[in-house]
A protein has these predicted regions:
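Periplasmic polypeptide-binding modules associated with outer-membrane biogenesis and secretion
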Residues: 1-171
Length: 171
């Protein structure tokens, strides 16, 4: 276990604490196993990644166990690893959302439309219905980036069955 790290980002500290307190497995008197503690780390990581901490990973969370205080009991402390690069703890917001719809045959003239979800650049002529993008894109400009919304957007676009490639990029 690495040395204890002072968490400079109190928002991250509060989020981890609130997620951990709500986890049904982390209760006083519970029996702990390595697999179960690993699952807790994954649940906390998933929750953080859906709240803007895109690069957060389960191995950033470490457990420190003390079995000396009382016989047959263990005091456990959860903390962040000491060697996490600061960039990995950065919180991200969704920026401008720009969607490109290209023609199968290539070519065409680009036409730009503002939708509720962002800017749509569509190569014309095209029979693609612009309102489909509002239904498929779940990300919102200015909100905390959520992996769940990114996955939902990709799934909805793929289900349309009209795209040969779906690419989500950070700029």
């Amino acid at each position: 276990v690495g040395s204890e790290m002072c968490i400079r980002d109190s928002t991250l500290h509060r989020l981890i604490d609130s997620i951990a307190v709500a986890d049904p497995y982390l209760r006083e008197g519970a029996r702990y196993s390595v697999d179960s503690l690993s699952e807790v780390r994954i649940r906390i990581t998933n929750a953080l990644r859906n709240r803007g901490y895109y690069y957060f990973r389960p191995d950033f969370i470490e457990y420190l166990a003390d079995t000396v205080q009382q016989p047959m009991k263990m005091a456990m402390r959860m903390m962040l690893a000491a060697d996490i690069p600061p960039a990995m703890l950065k919180r991200y917001r969704t920026g401008n959302v720009t969607m490109y719809v290209f023609r199968n045959q290539g070519g065409g003239e680009p036409d730009t439309f503002q939708t509720r979800r962002g800017t749509l650049i569509q190569m014309m002529p095209s029979r693609f219905r612009r309102e489909l993008m509002n239904e498929c894109v779940t990300m919102r400009t200015g909100r905390w980036f959520a992996v769940r919304q990114m996955n939902s957007t990709q799934t909805r676009l793929a289900r349309l069955g009209i795209f040969n490639a779906i690419n989500l990029e950070a700029e």
